Amino acid sequence: VTTLIVAVGLVLIASGTAMWVATRTVSAGEMLGIGGLAAVSLVGAVGVDSPCETQTAYYCLSVLEDPDLKSGRTLVLDDLRHSYVDLDDPTRLEFWYVRRIVDAIEAHATSPGVPLDAVYLGGGAFTVPRYVRATRPGSIQTILEIDGDLVDVVEERLDFDRQDDVEIVVGDGRLAVDELDDDSASLVVGDAFGSRAVPFHLATKEFLADVERVLRPTGIYVANIIDGPAEKFLRAEVATVAEVFNHVAVIRGPGIVSGRNGNSVVIASQSPLNERSLAQRLGRDVRLGGATSDDPDRVVGEVLVGDDLAQYLDGADILTDDFAPVDQLIGG
């Protein structure tokens, strides 16, 4: 994302310079000045010291070792801790939102250990696919990841073993979903939204309708959503999900509940959600509806379903291909 921003900025500078030159007579000295400014801009953009171990077309990417666990690794995209994996134990889940995604899978998917047909929008460090492979042998998983260089790093430095049970498709997620068969998946996981850049075409009602097409009637859609204290994007995205799916729940993360930036997780299906099983899975990490934590000093997440969810979503925007101001919603 950072690379794209820099590249777009340079293109805009060059375009603006060309337009300015075209509309006036410019001396040789002025032209040299313009060229010098452009050169300084370019050198500045390329020559800035970067913590990147790998600079891809989309990310400044690094892998950090866990100082407290020899087998622990954190994937950093730009300057954000995106994913964590334990190379020796794929069932060890470090991040709150990843544990909630797994809670949703285990609460609403088939019986424990039964294989899944899973699709992932965004790969990260492949943390959830590793978990599913370890806990549900025989699962068939498809990972849709736009950044091929990221895939290389995950395989080479995070020891992901690409076998016949996992297909990795490099390219745009929406185009890839369009190629999937009807009723072919029991699980779709969305983890393509960042805190600084949201691919709006993966947030719209039209795209979610395509996700619903791919899911079986009993399948579930689970997505990680990052937003700020105003929760405008979170509310809009969950409201949009509710336009497509009959049964929806949202788990507001501890950061959101405490009025900060943070992750939340939405769960959706055309079949009733197993709310009791979900509550058991969440335990003390999440409270239900308006209930309060039994420890007032401990900030926890919050699950909203039914009337509580309807009240939360009242007045929220519905995102469509013609109207999806995701950047403004996150910034608002």
Put a short name on every predicted segment.
Residues 1-23:
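Membrane-embedded alpha-helical segments of integral membrane proteins
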Residues 92, 99-220, 229-232, 244, ...:
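The AdoMet/dcAdoMet-binding core of the Class I SAM-like
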Residues 203, 236-237, 280-282:
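Composition- and surface-driven signal marking solvent-exposed, interaction-prone regions
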Residues 209-275:
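C-terminal substrate-binding/active-site "lid" region of AdoMet-derived donor-dependent transferases
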